[in-house]
Amino acid sequence: HIGAQTMGSNLNTWLNFLKIWSTYENIIFRFTSGEFLATRPNAILYATPLSNTFWEIYNKALQEGLSVNEIIKTLGKKRNAINFLNVNNLESFDHYNTIEFRCPNATLNPVIWQNNLNLFTKLIMRCKSEVDSLLIDKRHDELVKNGIPDNLKLYNETINLRQALEFCDLIFTNNLDKVYFLKQYLKSFKISIEPYYRAKKFTRTI
């Protein structure tokens, strides 16, 4: 959970968030599978991919001039990769006023906790500034042509190094952050669709 006030009420921040998540969700899902090579089997029920939904809402917001509150209302399902139902005030520091990221696999590894938290917080902070919309549009068009958005099977079976590097450069300014992200995303370039199949260890023991 991350405080909703971190996102704030600026419309461009929310539009950037929808656009970036929609375009790089396949990268994010593989990363947040943590020490496992695939997302947990019940993710399709309890952390449903949002790529297509976010893209539709993004375009609707542009065409119809939706406000941030109207955007949030359209995202009101709990069992998605991100749960916005607890968002009640975009300026409040209330303990329960949170955005819940549900896509990560459960883990007892504190390094993976930190990596996941670092990704989500840096993603939100990046959305507060200008992004390369033309690049993101181009990448999203390529994904659609290949049937990738919302396809959890392809999220698990595909490693896209070029897209992952692009995402790293978009989100992180620190090279060490990029290294930690790529280690957890690439997982020694191994792929498995079997649930709970562990990747080769990529974190130090704490």
Question: Which residue ranges define each predicted feature?
Answer:
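C-terminal accessory/tail domains of diverse enzymes
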Residues: 7-206
